[in-house]
Amino acid sequence: MDPSILTIRESLRGRTDVRLALVFGSRARGTAMPTSDVDVAVRAPGVDLLRLAADLSRVTGLEVDVVDLEDAGVPLLGRIVREGVRIHEAGAGVEARWRAQALADLETDVPWFARMRVAWLARVAARGI
């Protein structure tokens, strides 16, 4: 596993305020360059995510982008579901519950998102930006 991911995993060990952390993007896919950033999605109610990102950047020596799983839009949520690799779970079943909810959300939201995208593109084509 990527050393930066192992460092983040160790940094999060024992933290119960960060309920779930998933790495995604090039580090999860194994296509990262040595200076690539680290994309981490978290479920961490009440945690200052900018401070968390800064702390993780400090310990890894890399830019760490932290996104809130509760605020992820449809395209990003789909990517995290497909690519996300769990690096921290504060209790048994946290990831399973999150994935079940995310898949249910995607099941209903993806068709709506696709319709809105097509409608927006049609408006842009007809009227311009």
Residue ranges with predicted function:
Residues 39-41:
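Short, well-ordered beta-strand segments
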